Amino acid sequence: MNVSLDLFIEREPGDHGGLGGPDWVRIDESLHREFNARARAMSMMVEGRTVYEMMDPFWPNARGDSSLPDFMREFGEIWTTTPKVLVSRTRTTAGHNARIVGGDDAIAELAALRREADGDIGVGGATLATQLLASQLLDELLLFTHPAVLGAGRPLFDSLDRGEIDWPLQLDLLEHESFDNGVTMHRYAVRGVR
C-alpha cells in the first residue's frame, strides 16, 4: 500500500490519480521493479473493485505496448496472468484470470481461500484490507511510505471494527528498505493472526 508520511492514502476519497498514482506518490523505475518482484512472488491477488477497475484494462494492454518501458510491460504480464479474486458486490464478470467473490459471505470465502493457498496472497484495496485486518486474516502489512505530508485525507485504514482484535494491534518489523527517490518500504508481521 502506498501511503503518505502521515499515513493517508488519498487526499480525498477517489483521489487515485490513475495508474501513476496521485502527484504525491513517487513511483520511479526502481520502485516499480520492486513492485514487480513482489507481485511475481504472489500465488494470488485479492483486489477490491476500485483497485481492479484501475488495473483493467490498462495492465493487460500494457503487455504488448512497445511505447511503454519494459518494467511496465513486465508488470502487465504479471498482473494479467496471476490468479485474482475480485471482491465486489456489484460486478458480475471479470476477466484476466479473475473470479468474483461478493456478498455477505465474502470474508468467509476469503478465509477459506487463505487456508487453501499455496504461497503469498497480495491484497489491493484499503476497504478490503481494513475488513481483512479486522477479521484477523491479514498476517502482514507492506507499506511504501512516500515523503509527503498530506495533512488530511483518507487514512490507511477505514474505521476498524473492534471485532476480535486485542487492541492495540502489535506489529513486528520483518523488512525495511529505502529507495533513492525517498520512498521507504516497511514490511510488518501482524502479531496474533491465526
Regions found by a protein language model. Name each.
Residues 1-194:
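Enzymes that bind and transform nitrogen-containing heteroaromatic metabolites
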